[in-house]
Design a protein with these regions (language model features):
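Primarily the internal scaffold of c-type cytochrome electron-transfer domains
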Residues: 6-75, 81-86, 103, 107-119, ...
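Short acidic-aromatic active-site loops that bind/stabilize oxyanions
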Residues: 122-130, 201
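C-terminal substrate/ligand-recognition segments
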Residues: 128-143
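Conserved oxyanion/phosphate-binding beta-strand-loop segments in alpha/beta enzyme cores
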Residues: 88-91, 100
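Short hydrophobic-aromatic micro-motifs
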Residues: 91-93, 207
Length: 229
C-alpha cells in the first residue's frame, strides 16, 4: 500500500493501530522489566529479562507462583498489556499492565481478588486473547478454534491493525492499480469491498463500531457483511 499511498502510510506508522499488537522486543516493550515488583491481593509479581526475552513471575493457573514468558505487547497508550503463551495455542493477557503516562505497573482489577479457578483469572477464558481480544488488534484474524480439542490455531495476515483491517481485502485493488491508468477497467470502489470515503454517520458506525464498541463476537469478521445497524 505504501508505494502508492505514502502519506497515509506515514500517518499510520507508529499510530495506535500500528501499535495495537507487536512482538515483545527492546523497541516495543515499554514496561519496566529490570526486576520491578508489583504486589496486589497478597501476590507479588516480578518483571525481569533474560538475554533478549521478557518474563514475569506471578500466580499461575494452579495458584502457585510460576515463570511465564511475555511474547507480545498489546496496545501502546495510556496502557500497555502483555500476552503470555499457554498450551493449546492460547495467549493470555496478564492482569498487570504498564501505565505509560505515569510509568508504573498497576492492576486492572484493583478492587477485586480473583481466584485461580475463576473465569476472570488471567489464565482462564475471560482473559483469553484468542476469543476475547484478538480480532480487533490484528488484521484478517482467524481464530481457528477446534471445539473437539478445545485448542486454537489462530492466524493473522498482519499482527497489527493494518490497511486491510478497515479497507478490506486489497488484492483486487492492487491488481487494478498496477495497470496503466489509461487501460484500467471501470470497477466499483476501485476494487475495494469497503467504502471508506464520504461516509454518512451510519456508514461510519458500520466501519468502526465492530471494534470501537462494547460487543461480543460470534463469528470471524466478514468485510462484505459488516452492517451493524
Amino acid at each position: 500500500c505504501a508505494e502508492c499511498h505514502a502519506e497515509a502510510y506515514r500517518q499510520w506508522l507508529d499510530s495506535d493501530h500500528d501499535n495495537a499488537m507487536d512482538v515483545a522486543s527492546d523497541t516495543t516493550v515499554l514496561g519496566d522489566f529490570d526486576g520491578a515488583e508489583f504486589t496486589h491481593a497478597g501476590v507479588t509479581s516480578r518483571f525481569y529479562r533474560r538475554d533478549d526475552r521478557f518474563f514475569v513471575s506471578t500466580e499461575g493457573p494452579d495458584g502457585q507462583t510460576g515463570e511465564f514468558e511475555v511474547r507480545y505487547t498489546f496496545g501502546i497508550e495510556p496502557l500497555q498489556q502483555y500476552l503470555v503463551p499457554f498450551p493449546g495455542g492460547r495467549l493470555q493477557a496478564l492482569p498487570i499492565a504498564w501505565d505509560t503516562e505515569r510509568d508504573r505497573w498497576f492492576t486492572l482489577n484493583p478492587d477485586t481478588v480473583i481466584a485461580p479457578d475463576d473465569w476472570l483469572h488471567w489464565t482462564r477464558n475471560g482473559q483469553n486473547w484468542n476469543g476475547m481480544c484478538a480480532e480487533c488488534h490484528s488484521t484478517n484474524l482467524q481464530k481457528n478454534f477446534d471445539p473437539d480439542t478445545g485448542t486454537y490455531a489462530t492466524r493473522w495476515s498482519e499482527i497489527d491493525v493494518s490497511c486491510e483491517a478497515c479497507h478490506g481485502p486489497g488484492s483486487r485493488h492492487v491488481a487494478w492499480a498496477s495497470v496503466d491508468p489509461d487501460a484500467r477497467e471501470s470497477i466499483d470502489n476501485v476494487g475495494l469491498e469497503v467504502v471508506s470515503s464520504d461516509l454518512d454517520n451510519r456508514q461510519y458506525v458500520d466501519l468502526c463500531a465492530p471494534c470501537h464498541a462494547r460487543r461480543s463476537e460470534i463469528a470471524d469478521y466478514d468485510h462484505s457483511q459488516s452492517g451493524l445497524m
